[in-house]
Curated annotation (Swiss-Prot):
Xref: InterPro entries: Helicase/UvrB_N, Helicase_ATP-bd, Helicase_C-like, P-loop_NTPase
Coiled coil residues, start to end: none
Name under which the protein is recorded: Transcript termination protein A18
One Pfam family hit: Helicase_C
Species: Rabbit fibroma virus (strain Kasza)
Keywords, in A-Z order: ATP-binding, DNA-binding, Helicase, Hydrolase, Late protein, Nucleotide-binding, Transcription, Virion
Disulfides per UniProt: none
Binding site for ATP: L111, S112, C113, G114, F115, G116, K117, T118
Subcellular location: Virion
Alphabetized GO MF terms: ATP binding; DNA binding; helicase activity; hydrolase activity
Membership in a protein family: Belongs to the helicase family. Poxviruses subfamily.
Positions occupied by motif DESH box: 204-207
EC assignment: 3.6.4.-
Domain Helicase C-terminal, chain residue ranges per copy: 302-468
Length: 478
């Protein structure tokens, strides 16, 4: 259980530094999730993960006693490359120090996309030799964990049919590893069971959760805190450090050649009745999250045609072979899918549709294919999609925050046989009402990809055409 006490000025200041001015929410002594105000006389549950960092004064010693040992006999360590071994060495040293100083054994593994967080975490799982729960945000991530866990030869159970079905299964069967989706944590009985019977908890893609929200995960970490806990992410949320405050971060030295191709094209103005109607909402509250910006971009036929022509040409010339095309809206996704199917047929073109339950099977099939175009949304494929062989990313949408951009670019930053990785951007639009918005968001992608992720911007691609100016100059020279 987390520590329940009054939040004095020092502790309040420590907690607030993770929130960038946002309000602080915690569970009070009555287990209600409320805002914490300065000088409050109420008692609040303070997540024990906060004290995993030695810079935070330890209010009460945490005596970690792990009794749930793994039962498998012939356990093996997965193979790691040197930098992964370096991370393991840092983590194990830190965990021993936490144990000896009576601090909670909590750590965030802040490692770049493509580093191999999954296999590194499985190695640590074998080091601890304690029963483990692996929690993922969605079913799509389960397969990559299954593959990694099998390398250890630990027994495991995968739960995809709901927590009730899993609880029935656990009455007659046990396993060293449970792989679950985070929805399972809404069941209090299940939370108590894994707290009592499993010692290690691995939270994959921890940035997907805002732990300042009153969620099942927030409750679990507060009232059923694991004895050993790892958060895995390439783009950590600062506020989540309140629940897991110690971070290991190792920069990856990569042999990949990462290219950023910006395809510029100056279009003649284009509009339709549909576009004009939607443009009326651009400067209203309805466009707070730029939904109309993306809807209008979906209708930009000249830009869409340029994207299809560019990708088709590169794919035919085999300068790109395993391509993911990312959009924001489903209508945009089906447009590109239909166009690419006309060009190359269904043997090469696949749809990453979140509404289709067979999409995970499609993703698995792509692991063995030499050439394909995979069209999907940023919601489905922006985080956790595990197709290491991808060599190209085509970004068709505009509105992405910094975390989404880094996660999206990470889809093509994984080590594979192909060391040449290419990202395509299309910063121009034929629709004048969204010209500046598209340019602004494209600049953000360029900045993160070059300054933070090591992409090199290549010479500007495409054809620049300004028909009105061309006609004017032509008439002057006659």
């Amino acid at each position: 259980m987390s520590v329940c006490l009054e939040v004095d000025y020092t502790l309040y200041t420590e907690l607030k530094k993770f929130l960038n001015g946002q309000p602080l929410f915690l569970f009070n002594a009555d287990k209600n999730y409320v805002e914490v105000v300065p000088s409050s006389t109420l008692k609040f549950y303070i997540p024990i993960g906060l004290f995993s960092n030695s810079n935070v004064a330890l209010i009460r010693p945490v005596h970690t006693t792990c009794t749930n040992h793994i039962e498998s006999v012939d356990v093996t360590f997965p193979n790691l490359y040197p930098l992964q071994k370096h991370v393991v060495a840092e983590v194990t040293t830190s965990m021993r120090q936490k144990l000896s100083t009576h601090r909670p054994m909590y750590m965030t593994l802040h490692l770049s996309c493509g580093f191999g967080k999954t296999v590194t975490a499985c190695y640590l799982m074998v080091v601890h030799r304690r029963k483990t729960v692996i929690c993922v945000p969605n079913k799509m991530l389960i397969h990559q964990w299954k593959v990694a866990v099998e390398l250890t030869k630990l027994s495991y159970i995968i739960s995809t049919d709901g927590v009730s079905m899993l609880l029935k299964q656990l009455r007659t069967k046990t396993a060293d590893v449970l792989i679950i989706v985070s929805r399972h944590l809404s069941n209090d009985y299940f939370c108590k069971k894994i707290h009592d019977e499993y010692d290690t908890f691995i939270l994959d893609e921890s940035h997907m959760y805002n732990l300042m929200n009153n969620s099942a995960l927030t409750k679990f970490l507060t009232f059923y805190p694991p004895r050993i806990c790892y958060f895995l992410t390439a783009t950590p949320r600062l506020m989540n450090r309140i629940y897991c405050n110690d971070v290991v971060n190792v920069l990856k030295v990569s042999a990949l050649t990462k290219r950023l191709k910006i395809v510029e094209y100056f279009f003649e103005p284009y509009s339709t009745d549909c576009i004009r109607q939607m443009a009326k909402h651009l400067n209203t509250e309805n466009n707070k999250y730029h939904i109309y910006t993306e809807k209008i971009l979906t209708e930009d036929l000249p830009r869409n045609n340029l994207i299809v022509e560019t990708v088709s040409r590169e794919f035919r010339n085999e300068t790109i072979e395993r391509v993911i095309v990312i959009v924001k809206l489903r209508k945009h996704m089906t447009f590109f899918y239909d166009r690419f199917v006309k060009e190359f047929g269904t043997d090469y073109v696949y749809l990453g549709d979140a509404k289709n339950k067979d999409t995970s099977t499609v993703v698995k099939s792509l692991l063995q294919k030499k050439k394909f175009i995979f069209v999907s949304t940023s919601h489905y494929s922006g985080t956790g999609l595990d197709i290491p062989s991808l060599d190209s990313l085509v970004i068709c949408c505009a509105v992405l925050n910094s975390m989404q951009i880094e996660q999206l670019l990470g889809r093509v930053c994984r080590e594979s046989e192909s060391v040449k990785k290419t990202v395509f951007l299309f910063p121009n639009t034929s629709i004048r009402e969204i010209k500046h918005s598209l340019g602004f968001f494209t600049e953000r992608i360029v900045s993160i990809s070059t300054d933070k992720l090591g992409f090199e911007q290549e010479g500007i691609e495409g054809t620049k055409e300004e028909p009105v100016l061309t006609k004017a100059f032509s008439s002057q020279t006659r």
